[in-house]
């Protein structure tokens, strides 16, 4: 175990000098020995010659000074894995931060690992029912798939993710890992108590590196959560991996890249953006032993989906749920855009011909309404043909029927949440498109579950 000395400290970047014959490898973890700051860990990022390595601090570098001794552990950061992590809150290093004592793990894994080989990977077409009408209809999720929730600031990414956790994780017999990457500490706290109240805390491992943490923590915390999920998958379990927020992972990479002195690329992002995203996403996969179904929130800067960060994420996903500010402005929640959201599972060979036809029918009606909006704005409804008037009326009902009350928003709305089965969703939209409910007022469709609820509501209007 070689030792070196700190020769330079610039914020989160620390240079350590070792003997020429015992220079640590890239990604090795170094421990700083100091009476006041004994727990600080550094991760080697670059070897810059003459025995000097440039590292990123996995914690606050306050009180760090030149001359302190750094011990090379000879391996990457290792974190606890296995049953002992369930019900616990950990930081990037796998240390408990819930004041419930040591984790007492039997096994630890390094956070840098190779993704499964092609031979080991497995595809799945089994659908995961979420109980959210617009998702189950337009962009169905696959068990073992990768799902992204895209949206700008304040359109409901976290609320949608919490609802999916509520509907899937609580009913799901497997295990869940929740990774908070650069988001609000309050949300992590709320999540912990929600899981506790639901009695499923013993099935969830939580790893947090929130927005007040240094960039090193935020860059590596996603890998820590993923490593815990991989262990469960390799044991033959089905795991749900929630990551909130992938954009903060990219942003932490940008900060680290700038601190290391790399030249920025497009829009100021790090030149290694695609590679860093690939390193994380390629490991989130299912094997013949078990599956990882991942749901990731992706912040979209300035609502621009062509920004390099969300654009790089798109390539890795099986289903994309796009949240729209325009739909949120109309007061229609969940503000999921049915014309922008996609899924590889929406294929007649996977979901069946009926489901496919209904979903495409809904999109066709909404697309036609979108095209007619300009004419309506200029000339008014009276100038439309009878067919177009009918299309507009149905489209407005479809828009409203795509809304539903959420369990997690019950405290704000006062309306109890509803889980809508796929069968009820298909029945409702099929009837709507065929004209069965043309005489029902459009207000009746707002915030209802199945079509039977709409008919009941219409009777009271």
From Swiss-Prot:
Pfam families: ATP-synt_ab (PF00006), ATP-synt_ab_N (PF02874), ATP-synt_VA_C (PF22919). It comes from the Bacteria. It is an enzyme of class 7 (translocase). GO terms for cellular component: plasma membrane; proton-transporting ATP synthase complex. It is a peripheral membrane protein. Gene3D superfamilies: 2.40.10.170, Bovine Mitochondrial F1-atpase, Atp Synthase Beta Chain, Chain D, domain 3, P-loop containing nucleotide triphosphate hydrolases. Produces ATP from ADP in the presence of a proton gradient across the membrane. The catalytic sites are hosted primarily by the beta subunits. This is ATP synthase subunit beta 2. It comes from Photobacterium profundum (strain SS9).
